[in-house]
Amino acid sequence: MGFEILHEDARTQARLGRLTTAHGVVDTPVFMEVGTLGTVKALEPRDLVETKAQVVLGTTYHLMLRPGPEVLAAAGGLHRFMRWDGPILTDSGGFQVFSLAKMRKFTEEGCRFNSHLDGHEFFLGPKESMAMQKVIGSDIAMVFDECLPYPCDRDRAESSVARTIRWAQVSKGQPHAEGQQVFGIVQGGVYDDLRRRCAEELVKIGFDGYAIGGVSVGEPEECMYQAVDASVPYLPKDKPRYVMGLGVMHQMAECVARGVDMFDCVIPTRIARHGTAITRKGNVAIKAAKWIYDQGPVEEGCECYCCRNFTRSYVRHLLACDEILGLRLLTIHNVHALNRFMADLRESIRADAFGDFLAQVRSYRN
């Protein structure tokens, strides 16, 4: 198991890679589907295979609350529970504790909080997070960190970085599932020197890969790129780099140009549930009246199950009637669209044409 760089772009930091996990090989750069509660919303595992999904992301916080560690242990882990044979990455639960949970109380050991579901009290820290991820049996586990909001003042960012580093050290020392890789998470907000400090300290601890956290939390796009630029130079070249919570096509392409290999986001499934289709040339509101009589596919040239078999008119009809099939078809399309985009991106790196690919992506955005 490990990460191998197969080819590098001559004009940018984009690289083509291969990440080997206990449940299979992942071609990078990769977009990972979010399956918060052990399911990518509206999709079956066979849909994920057909849409060329490579990795599913599970959320430790949500899985800890329900179904809980006892149920997952009885099932033999999340792979068996959800019948997904491919790689699974789990986040640590830190983001959800800081963004969803109520009545938070911090200590050096972690965070005591009340569930957003029923108010029941829980405690989650680096030891508890890694123990839960061991039960889940994910191929890649993330260290427990403190995810900062935007904006955030320097004093809080500095104390958060120190805590994130301490928690990373504790996380690294916990028992892991067999074959489980562990990634560190760089924090530091918009402060370049803090991100450098965090990255360098995490590298000293030593991890199988490194994530750039605290981005895509409401900051301007230029601040997101600044955070990536402030982190990547201090991360090992021979380890995968992962920007958390990012799933917009042009933003992923820009980050790949900066040397990033992995991404995840709820965008493709979430906007599908609101009637929006992802296409190479931009998002399309399928609920719009202009598609009432349109007999073309959701996206011309798309080979997903939805576009091969159904029209914009029909999908719009389903959405207008609140039929579950409409959400499912549009989710299939959106997940396929992002995975196709990443496959095309990888091929452009392989063919030494990433610069042209990036220029085309930028032209669609503009």
Q: What is each of the regions a protein language model found here?
A:
Residues 1-18, 26-30, 42, 145-151, ...:
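C-terminal extensions of enzymes
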Residues 24, 56, 91, 133, ...:
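Conserved, mostly hydrophobic/aromatic
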Residues 137, 168, 172-175, 206, ...:
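Structural signal for hydrophobic packing residues in well-ordered secondary-structure cores
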Residues 1-176, 289-292:
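Non-catalytic, usually N-terminal nucleic-acid engagement modules in DNA/RNA processing proteins
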Residues 150-151, 158, 209-215, 324-327:
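Glycine- and acidic
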Residues 162-165, 174-298:
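Glycine-rich phosphate/ribose-binding loops and adjacent secondary-structure elements
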Residues 128, 132-136, 159, 163-170, ...:
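A non-catalytic, amphipathic alpha-helix used as a structural packing/dimerization or gating element
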